[in-house]
Each structure stands twice: as structure tokens, then as C-alpha cells.
């Protein structure tokens, strides 16, 4: 009987909401012997509202791979129409999200210009405000409950921000908060 962690280590299948984000090494010296223990680091997507992946120039490519893996897994595990993704990338020429460029704009958007970023965040803030008002006026406690009660279900929105604060002006930073 194979556990979840065994299947991950064997590079087999794993839940779409669990994504490996890197490896961590621990080095010890015990009785004159140098020992290195390496462990994989995972993030559970379903239990996080915000995830920050910091990188430097040496790790930028790996960080982009992690972001693409996270977005790809979220999209693959969602039914059509239940997830919208926006990639805010003022330096879009770095090819971070090329793999997703073929998707319909209603599913995946790439925003690079400061005015487009501000407009998108303004629209999302107003839209979220309307949903919250509906939640407060109704007997539902969460977006999940809201979607269960509605015929036209509200999709989940994921906003990926690359190279923050590049491309953001003071108004878009305020909207993001």
C-alpha cells in the first residue's frame, strides 16, 4: 500500500492541489562525517489565499517553472468556466507565461501595461464588492456556498503577479491592497 508521499517520491501521480516548489538541503557533521539530507518542499493550493515566491537572478527560471506548474495544475483541476487566471507581467518579454498564451482571453489574460493592470484590478475590486454584498444579504457563508445556491456560478479568480512592483502605479497598488 503506497502512501501519498511515496507516490510523489516515485514521480507518480499526486493530488492536483499539491505542488512541489523546491528542495531544501540540510547539512550536518556527525562524528566527523558530513551528512546531507534533502527534502522536497510542497505547497497545498487549496488552503492558501496568497503565495509569494521570491527569487533572485539565479533562481528566476526555477521560480517561473514553479508558477507555471501551479497555474497549470489549478487550470487542469478546474472544470471549464470555474477558474479565471490573470498574469500581471510588466516584463512579459521574458516568456514566463508563453505556455498559456494560446488560451482564450476569458480564461487566461496577460496584463503588461500599467493602465491595463489598474483597470483590471479596479474591475475585480468592484466585482468582489458585489459578491460580498450578495453574500452578506443572503444566508451563504462562503463563495463555495454562494456557487452552490446560484444557477450561474461565480468562477474563482487567480491573479499571478510577476516582478512586483514593476508595472504598478500608486493607484493599482492601492487597489491590490
Segments from the language model and where they lie:
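Coiled-coil termination/hinge junctions
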Residues: 1-24
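P-loop NTPase catalytic phosphate-binding loop
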Residues: 19-177
Amino acid at each position: 500500500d503506497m502512501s501519498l508521499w511515496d507516490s510523489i517520491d516515485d514521480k507518480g501521480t499526486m493530488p492536483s492541489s499539491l505542488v512541489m516548489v523546491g528542495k531544501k538541503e540540510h547539512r550536518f557533521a556527525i562524528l566527523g562525517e558530513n551528512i546531507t539530507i534533502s527534502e522536497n518542499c510542497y505547497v497545498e493550493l487549496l488552503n492558501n489565499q496568497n503565495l509569494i515566491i521570491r527569487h533572485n537572478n539565479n533562481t528566476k527560471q526555477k521560480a517561473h517553472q514553479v508558477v507555471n506548474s501551479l497555474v497549470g495544475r489549478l487550470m487542469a483541476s478546474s472544470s471549464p468556466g470555474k477558474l479565471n487566471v490573470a498574469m500581471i507581467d510588466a516584463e512579459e518579454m521574458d516568456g514566463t507565461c508563453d505556455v498559456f498564451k494560446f488560451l482564450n482571453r476569458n480564461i487566461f489574460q496577460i496584463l503588461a501595461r500599467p493602465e491595463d493592470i489598474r483597470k483590471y484590478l479596479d474591475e475585480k475590486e468592484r466585482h468582489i464588492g458585489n459578491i460580498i454584498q450578495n453574500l452578506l444579504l443572503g444566508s451563504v457563508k462562503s463563495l463555495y456556498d454562494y456557487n452552490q445556491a446560484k444557477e450561474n456560478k461565480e468562477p474563482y479568480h487567480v491573479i499571478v503577479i510577476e516582478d512586483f512592483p514593476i508595472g504598478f502605479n500608486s493607484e493599482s497598488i492601492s487597489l491590490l491592497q
